Regions:
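C-terminal tail/extension regions appended to the core domain(s) of diverse proteins
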Residues: 76-108
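Short terminal alpha-helical segments
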Residues: 1-35, 99-136
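Intrinsically disordered, low-complexity segments enriched in small/polar residues
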Residues: 51-54, 64, 85, 89, ...
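Short, charged early-sequence alpha-helical segments and their helix-coil boundaries
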Residues: 41-77
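Short, cationic, amphipathic peptide segments
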Residues: 58, 65-69, 84-88, 95, ...
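Residue-level recognition of alpha-helical structural elements
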Residues: 3, 21-28, 41, 47, ...
């Protein structure tokens, strides 16, 4: 059963993967924790967007283990797309926008792992991706 919105669930899963696979990157774990708080308290995405780009950015983290690496990259893409578009499209709720970003990433033809994309999207929408990270 869904407990949090999709964006929060995606951020929590990013944090969980990082805590599990690279606990030595406490600065990025803390960064994601702030992103979660910023979103839940103020519906703010600016801090999260600052994580991308430049030397030593979120995009420069080492590989995660197994499918965590693919899931981590998938979630980063979805969260970045959402953060970039949030507040720029009038008349669309954050939840609907996140669903669109998730659908776009899931359906992207250039991704070689269509079944995994669909499984990630399904569990993210259901709010149980965190519990299923090691099953994917």
């Amino acid at each position: 059963m869904k407990q949090a919105d999709i964006y929060t669930e995606a951020l929590v899963c990013l944090r969980t993967i990082l805590q599990t696979d690279h606990p030595e990157f406490q600065n990025w774990i803390d960064w994601l924790e702030r992103d979660i708080q910023d979103w839940n308290q103020r519906r703010e995405v600016a801090h999260h967007l600052r994580a991308y780009g430049g030397m030593g950015s979120f995009n420069d983290l080492p590989s995660m283990r197994g499918n965590h690496d693919y899931i981590f990259d998938f979630l980063k893409s979805v969260c970045y797309a959402f953060g970039h578009l949030y507040g720029k499209r009038e008349g669309i709720s954050p939840e609907t926008l996140m669903e669109e970003c998730l659908h776009d990433a899931e359906q992207a033809a250039y991704h070689p792992h269509k079944a995994l994309n669909q499984a990630i999207a399904h569990h993210l929408m259901q709010g149980d991706l965190q519990e299923n990270l090691d099953r994917l």
